[in-house]
Regions:
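Short phosphate-binding loop-to-helix
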Residues: 11-44, 105
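A conserved acidic beta->alpha catalytic loop
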Residues: 2-6
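Active-site acidic Asp-centered loop
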Residues: 48-50
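Conserved catalytic core of nucleotide-sugar-dependent glycosyltransferases
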Residues: 78-95
């Protein structure tokens, strides 16, 4: 989270999750810090985007299972990005891990895989779609996943 939200934190605790504040400069630095810091407390960490209305419990379970045999899991998106990233090894997440990765673009997945070229194995999950442009909102409404 960018700011502390007492209601969200309370709900997360009710279902056995922990919510933390983000720190770092850009998105890559914040993601890196969240993965590295989270792995100091837990064996596996998933960062999940908030713009994928079709991401469900089954997909999250695939991501967790993907970390059984990999140090990193990526949930692909149809547009070349990803809807989640996870890890099981804190040593992967050094300060320059996302350097050169064009996050938020159609190149995010490809760039991230290049940035992870020294990490093996990496699990890549089947692509989902996320909401980035007005047509995606229409798609979500037509599928009944957004009002």
């Amino acid at each position: 989270l960018d700011d502390h939200d007492d209601r969200l934190a309370a709900h997360a605790r009710e279902i056995g999750l922990e919510v933390g504040l983000q720190h770092g400069g850009g998105l890559g630095e914040r993601m890196n810090a969240a993965l590295r810091d989270g792995l100091q407390e837990a064996a596996r960490v998933l960062l999940v985007g908030s713009d994928c209305p079709v991401l469900d419990q089954t997909y999250l379970a695939l991501a967790v299972d993907g970390l059984d045999n990999a140090r990193v899991v990526l949930g692909a998106s149809e547009d070349g990005g990803y809807v989640l990233i996870g890890g099981s090894d804190a040593s992967v997440w050094h300060d320059r891990r996302f350097e050169g990765v064009r996050l938020g673009t159609d190149y995010a997945m490809a760039d991230t895989l290049v940035a992870l070229n020294d990490v093996a194995p990496v699990t890549v999950l089947p692509p989902l779609w996320d909401v980035d442009i007005p047509e995606d909102v229409t798609r979500a409404r037509n599928l009944g996943v957004l009002p």
